[in-house]
Design a protein with these regions (language model features):
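Conserved N-terminal Rossmann-fold NAD(P) cofactor-binding segment
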Residues: 1-33
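General small-molecule cofactor/ligand-binding pocket signal
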Residues: 24, 91, 151
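Residues at or immediately preceding the N-termini of alpha-helices
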Residues: 27-28, 46, 132
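N-terminal Rossmann-like NAD(P) cofactor-binding module of classical short-chain dehydrogenase/reductase
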Residues: 37-38
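Rossmann-like NAD(P)(H) cofactor-binding subdomain of soluble oxidoreductases
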Residues: 43-109
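Substrate/ligand-engaging "lid" and interaction regions
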Residues: 77, 97-211
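Conserved small/polar residues in nucleotide/adenosyl-binding loops
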Residues: 214-216
Length: 216
């Protein structure tokens, strides 16, 4: 089940039950014959998944990574190193099209996913940039990007490096975590709260820390 507040400027909402055609640890089964591939894993996992993907690439595939975090650069590098010459379009985005939280009830994780916000515009690029027209055109066929497509639309970045630097998370999360570490530790040690109820945004940030972020 997917629903939630879905905050966005234009009031775009989409809720309902989601049925997955396939769930597998065998990537070959998942990507075989696919035209559009979405990679949405943490940056620390990029190398493992991309190395697994390279031998499975097929001509005509279009790969979108949310959030890119230089995954497109890494994928092209791995293709060269592994001798892959498939004709694919590789690109990524500066952030995710929406932010979600899995609902937890009485200590149990449920199958209910709440969307907290939806993006109305995202910055994207591909490598090489000569593929940018086809890459941007493929966005129309990604339902996860509908709030962007029907919002202010996707923005074309200058290069893949531009997309990497356009991600604000490193600028926000790292200083907020380091400067708010006392709040993080005291959240459970002093105040007795459940560790997983801590929120960097709600409990770690304060006006003085936010002021320091402006100067970074």
């Amino acid at each position: 089940m997917l629903d939630g507040i879905q905050r966005n400027l234009y009031g775009f909402e989409r809720s309902g039950r989601v049925f997955l055609d396939i769930v597998s640890t065998d990537m070959r089964k998942v990507v075989k014959g696919a035209k559009l591939i979405i990679i949405g894993v943490p940056a620390l996992s990029h190398e493992y998944y991309l190395k697994t993907l390279v031998p499975l690439l097929e001509d005509g595939m279009i790969i979108h990574t949310f959030t890119d975090n230089y995954a497109s650069l890494l994928l092209r590098k791995l293709m060269r190193e592994m001798g892959c010459t498939k004709d694919v379009i590789i690109g990524g985005w500066s952030s995710a099209p929406y932010g979600t939280r899995i609902e937890k009830i009485c200590g149990f994780w449920t199958n209910h996913v709440g969307i907290k916000y939806r993006a109305i515009s995202l910055r994207g690029a591909c490598l090489p940039m000569s593929d940018i027209d086809d890459f941007m055109e493929s966005v129309k066929y990604l339902p996860c990007m509908d709030s962007v497509t029907l919002g202010e639309g996707p923005q074309r970045g200058d290069t893949m490096l531009d997309i990497g630097f356009a991600n604000v998370n490193p600028v926000i999360h790292v200083p907020a975590s380091l400067l708010g570490v006392s709040s993080m530790e005291n959240w459970s040690l002093v105040y007795g709260n459940a560790p997983d109820s801590y929120s960097m945004y709600s409990h770690g940030l304060c006006p003085s820390i936010c002021l320091s972020l402006i100067h970074i």
